[in-house]
């Protein structure tokens, strides 16, 4: 066979018949996922849901809503955080084109189409999609709902700290520091503006330096808030909060808040939303137990949940330098805090804390790290909520896929194959060692002069092999 050579410039064919178009066997994970969606009647359901938001019988037909949501699912399963990356991946892969249902003769949707559709469809449609997936879990007995864990994390916003401006005057950071230097008499009004090095030196020397959300905002994304990230750096960010079923690891609610909201401010709202989602998914179970970390502990929150809800809290108390003083607080507050302390320090409370730490942190690892949601490329809290809800729905679909087909992600199929090969190899080695042992034992029986020591030595060598 002669060696083929790649041509630097190739003349493309003017016309290609259908039988010459490239074919793909498809990815088994996405074929199975399409099977699950088809069995649930996803496309007809989502088209009926989105129909009121389109013109009736006028204009060019849009991209089907099922294709839009599938592309967002691809973003989670492939770990792609940007819409440009999703559009490129879908156009580049024959198996993903098959998953989306796009014929080979048609172009895949552009990234701008995702923006248009997202802006057209309200948050309620994305929320309905999340609940539809929860209903699938409910039908497969993958929701328990009685005991939940709550935790939060920060998402980096699509806005830079360099772009923030003063709310009162509209000055950016350089203009603000220049004015302070003029007021301090370090420079005159008619002097040339100081360079960046002089501004940084002056900024470090200030004792009352403060960057507050009350005074500063981002013109790029006014909904983003200044917050400290998990790695200790300061960024404009959002806050994501998960309510996780501790029985199955399913996400019951995935809420996005402003980053300056404290955990104690959002706990009750997230629990209520999780209960609403459970009911709309067809579950009759009510949330009874809620476990969270010490960041969610406050006297007011514990008391509010005890007196006005049915949730039983398991929230550890933060360490205090001094004992709590109850003389200036109502007795019901003391009773609520002591009851929560007693439950949390018990055997069941410690078990729930271990489960919460394992399962809720795992959902953030899947959605934010491998799912690509740690850094958002969208502006506005409404847009961030829409995209994050679909990422959480994709996580729940992964749980369903793992339950049905033993693979929760496209990469999980390869891991399953490796695990299966490892099990087969282990059984083969065990069988080989056992065979050698019985053979050596038979030889020692037929030749009494052989000692038991030699038999044991041969067996040891067989096990090592």
Predicted feature residues:
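Short amphipathic alpha-helical interaction patches enriched in hydrophobic/aromatic residues
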Residues: 54, 75-76, 98, 118-121
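An anion-engaging/catalytic patch
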Residues: 47-49, 94, 110
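A detector of single, family-specific signature residues
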Residues: 50, 87-88, 98
